[in-house]
Amino acid sequence: MHFRKYLVGGIRKVKKVVKFGGSSLASAEQFKKVGNIIRKEESRRYVIPSAPGERTPDDTKVTDMLYSCYGQAILGEDAEKDFEEQLEAIKERYNSIISGLDLELSLDEEFKTIRTNFSKKIGRDYAASRGEYLNGIIMAAYLGYEFIDAAEVIVFDENGNFDGDKTHEILSARLENTERAVIPGFYGAKPDGSIQTFSRGGSDITGSIVAKAVHADMYENWTDVSGFLIADPRIIKNPKPIDVITYRELRELSYMGATVLHEDAIFPVRKEGIPINIRNTNAPEDKGTLIVEDTCRKPRFTITGIAGKKDFASITIEKAMMNSEVGFCRKVLEVFENNHISIEH
């Protein structure tokens, strides 16, 4: 693998962006694993954390807890008790991580702000984003890295569409002289300062955006699996791992249901020729899956992978003389658009 390098004090070093998913940051124990991974390589300079995920199969992700808590806030006085109890449960999740890491850190002021903004019904995107925001504060304190609020550097327009050019301009300038930083994933802000999130799993996208901004040599995406498998292990017994896959192959698998990496995380790094390495926080010795633009390696299998999606509806349209009616397909597609229905073809 060829790495671009940069000079620091005359020493040539590799620069990496590392993103950790919710399962990798669900508890203090998982945080410690992440800390060991980051400290093992000096090149891991920019960290993108997700919100705490499930600690056990019957646990609840913090993002879902925040959605539920905000739902109680919207109900007002009738649900005030449930709102306070749920907010306290979220606070306890974070405090358990802080105490487990022996950090001298208090999130009391942050939770006062969250309580106030929830009461003002500030929006679901703000509510959901607090999971990554708070985890970012803890991660920065734990590592001794600078904390950068994603709302300051990830830009959306007034309609909630991601502004890649503006983000790259602001983020590149902000990180130009920043050696090490923690930037929460999943969210950014509109011009008026209101919080806007990516779709679920959007921390993958944030990591890719940061990798592009700092001209990283590698974007490592750490999760709870050792990369992509040829098939879903819940359906196929003992599927083989995929060592190397191209962006194009990954894009197809992502569209068809492979969920290890958010499908939109490919674009920013692909344009810059930055490879992505999917790694396992719980098995850091595994090499995982390397995602590249192209490879000259001869694949082990004719088929790279198999993926699928459930709950599709198949629609067949029949009409006499349809092939001679100009604009027919456009009219059909407009029906889907007007009803906010995406299509696969």
Labelled PLM ranges:
Residues I148, P184-G185, W222, R279-T281, ...:
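Generic beta-strand/beta-sheet core signal
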Residues P52-G53, V225-G227, I276, N280-E285, ...:
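Glycine-rich beta-alpha junction loops
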Residues E104-L107, L261-D264, P275-P284, I317, ...:
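Flexible, glycine/charged-enriched surface loops at secondary-structure junctions
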Residues E272:
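Active-site scaffold of zinc-dependent metalloenzymes
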Residues K287-H345:
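A conserved regulatory-domain signal marking ACT and ACT-like small-molecule sensing domains
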Residues K5-I266:
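Nucleotide/pyrophosphate-binding catalytic subdomain
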